[in-house]
């Protein structure tokens, strides 16, 4: 072999011949800001420019497409729309994304909601006191000595939770009174988590609240883990205050209610921000109808640990929670960074905002 020739074994290893790409293969496209010179750049400009960028930019644009198709559907016989289940974790209500979630509920863009206890109480607490920016590296012991509770790079003064107790306990008293007065009557009151949230949404009477709008628009809000947070603390304290009488909250009636909504849906769509109970509760309801027709997951969890949060949509297909052949995507992004862009190009776009 001549010194000026590449060894054949090296050439065979490195210079592998490519096949012809199939007809219609999408090329990677670049976002060229020169195209927007001399005019304002819109959200639509950005999303269209990111569509074929690759990685999570393309996944986010796929989420936009799926949600827009979700919203455009009409049953050919009844003209019924897609039943859209929205799920989100409590930290998103603590963050400024709360306003985006409130917008969806205020304008009746979703059919039902599932969240955690924190996702309920933090909404009401933010009507009673402010949440502040902090730092992910703020020292826990220092914050504890100052009565400040950290949520990522946010802090909530402990006094906000005291204000929440002052507000919610009299309502719990009234609910117990109504429950006891109805015993043995034809209209006996059976409180459920969704009924409790509905009542609190009415009582807060504040347009900044997500659940005020859920009450006003009669959008059911489910919280199977209602006791897992400050609201649970208040219910615990109330058991002593009210003893021997006890407020009863029935989770069985609520599981029947959410599953029935899924079963009766002409078409079901899931938009789930975060993971855990909010993700699985919606997916499991859709199992009752052999799966949702479309799904958008937005979270940063990985699947290698077998967690519910990390699971991709295809895992839900294996369980019958998303239909075979359904339109689904998982966007591996933190929801506060991704969801405002998605809403701007879906729900808010129709509203002309």
Curated annotation (Swiss-Prot):
Signal peptide: none annotated. Pathway: Protein modification; eIF5A hypusination. The keyword Transferase applies. Spermidine binds at residues 121-122, 233, 280, 306-308, 315-321. GO terms for molecular function: deoxyhypusine synthase activity. One of its GO terms (cellular component) is cytoplasm. Pfam families: DS. Its EC number is 2.5.1.46. NAD(+) binds at residues 90-94, 116-118, 122, 228, 275, 300-301, 334-335. Gene3D superfamilies: Deoxyhypusine synthase. Keywords: Hypusine biosynthesis, NAD, Transferase. The keyword NAD applies. The active site is at residue 321. InterPro entries: Deoxyhypusine_synthase (IPR002773), Deoxyhypusine_synthase_sf (IPR036982), DHS-like_NAD/FAD-binding_dom (IPR029035). It comes from the Eukaryota. Its cofactor is NAD(+). One of its GO terms (biological process) is spermidine metabolic process. Belongs to the deoxyhypusine synthase family. Homotetramer. NCBIfam families: dhys. Catalyzes the NAD-dependent oxidative cleavage of spermidine and the subsequent transfer of the butylamine moiety of spermidine to the epsilon-amino group of a specific lysine residue of the eIF-5A precursor protein to form the intermediate deoxyhypusine residue. This is Deoxyhypusine synthase. It comes from Neurospora crassa (strain ATCC 24698 / 74-OR23-1A / CBS 708.71 / DSM 1257 / FGSC 987). The lineage of its organism: Eukaryota, Fungi, Dikarya, Ascomycota, Pezizomycotina.
């Amino acid at each position: 072999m001549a010194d000026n020739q590449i060894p054949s074994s090296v050439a065979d290893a490195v210079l592998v011949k490519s096949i012809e790409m199939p007809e219609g293969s999408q090329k990677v496209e670049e976002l060229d800001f020169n195209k927007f010179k001399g005019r304002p750049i819109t959200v639509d400009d950005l999303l269209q420019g990111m569509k074929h960028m690759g990685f999570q930019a393309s996944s986010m644009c796929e989420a936009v497409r799926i949600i827009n198709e979700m919203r455009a559907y009409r049953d050919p016989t009844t003209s019924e729309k897609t039943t859209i289940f929205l799920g989100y974790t409590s930290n998103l209500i603590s963050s400024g994304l709360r306003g985006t979630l409130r917008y969806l509920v205020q304008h009746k863009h979703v059919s039902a909601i599932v969240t955690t206890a924190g996702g309920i109480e933090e909404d009401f607490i933010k009507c009673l006191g402010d949440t502040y920016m902090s730092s992910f590296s703020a020292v826990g012991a220092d914050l504890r000595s100052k009565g400040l509770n950290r949520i990522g790079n946010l802090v909530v003064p402990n006094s906000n939770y005291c204000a929440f107790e002052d507000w919610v306990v009299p309502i719990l008293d009234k609910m117990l009174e109504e429950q006891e007065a109805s015993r043995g009557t034809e209209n006996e009151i059976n409180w459920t988590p969704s009924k409790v949230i509905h009542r609190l949404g009415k009582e807060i009477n504040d347009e900044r609240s997500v659940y005020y709008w859920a009450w006003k628009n009669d959008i059911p809000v489910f919280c199977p883990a209602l006791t897992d947070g400050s609201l649970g603390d208040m219910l615990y304290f109330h058991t002593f205050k009210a003893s021997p009488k006890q407020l009863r909250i029935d989770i069985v009636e609520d599981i029947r209610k959410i599953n029935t909504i899924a079963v009766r849906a002409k078409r079901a769509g899931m938009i789930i921000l975060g993971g855990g109970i909010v993700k699985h509760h919606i997916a499991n309801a859709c199992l009752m109808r052999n799966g949702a027709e479309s799904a958008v997951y937005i979270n940063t969890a990985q699947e290698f640990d077998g967690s519910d949060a990390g699971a991709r949509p295809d895992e839900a297909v294996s369980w019958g929670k998303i239909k075979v052949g359904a339109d689904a995507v998982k966007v591996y992004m933190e929801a506060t960074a991704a969801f405002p862009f998605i809403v701007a190009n879906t729900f808010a776009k129709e509203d002309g905002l």
